[in-house]
């Protein structure tokens, strides 16, 4: 396990090697140095039931029987599922914290619905990204609401 500072340092070293990067997942504990670097943020919000099914499918595909009863990852996976099920209410990190972070970003934030197909969401991301690359640096031109 890496400390918060180690995570940020290692990640910054990796992304500084290229001109562009894609960041995926929650960065709740170490986002600050990266926030000014984002040109576009994508916030995917899925209904609890849909999210839980997808998490279980992804874990099974990635880790196989290791996440099933008797597997070496079973206990940890169950703890993760418990936290994920509480995301909309009192889980940590929770939906409210992520929304507050997204609202504080100096770039456009595209909100996607988990109920939409991956193909539809990809289409929206590509459209938003094309718009961003044609405009000045995101932090220099944003005004008004950023949730779309």
Regions found by a protein language model. Give the residues of each.
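A glycine- and Lys/Arg-enriched "phosphate-lid" helix/loop adjacent to the NTP-binding pocket
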Residues: 45-94
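Short beta->alpha linker loops
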Residues: 25-26, 46-47, 75, 113-117
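Glycine-rich, phosphate-binding/catalytic loops in enzymes
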Residues: 38-41, 58-61, 128-129
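Glycine-rich phosphate-binding loop used to anchor ATP phosphates in small-molecule kinases
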Residues: 3-48
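Short glycine-/acidic-enriched loop or helix-start segments at secondary-structure transitions
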Residues: 31-34, 53, 121-122
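NTP-dependent small-molecule kinase module
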Residues: 82-148
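Soluble or luminal CAZymes and related metallo-dependent hydrolases
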Residues: 3-10, 22, 76, 90-94, ...
């Amino acid at each position: 396990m890496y400390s918060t500072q180690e995570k940020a340092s290692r990640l910054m070293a990796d992304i500084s090697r290229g001109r562009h990067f894609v960041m995926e997942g929650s960065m709740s504990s170490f986002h600050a140095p990266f926030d000014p670097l984002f040109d576009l943020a994508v916030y995917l919000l899925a209904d609890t039931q849909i999210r839980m099914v997808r998490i279980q499918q992804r874990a099974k595909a990635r880790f196989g029987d290791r996440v099933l009863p008797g597997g070496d990852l079973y206990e940890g996976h169950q703890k993760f599922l418990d936290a994920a099920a509480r995301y909309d209410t009192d889980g940590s990190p929770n939906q409210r914290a992520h929304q507050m972070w997204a609202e504080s970003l100096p770039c456009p934030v595209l909100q996607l619905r988990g109920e939409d197909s991956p193909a539809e969401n990809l289409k929206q991301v590509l459209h938003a990204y094309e718009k961003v690359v044609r405009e000045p640096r995101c932090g220099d031109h944003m005004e008004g609401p950023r949730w779309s």
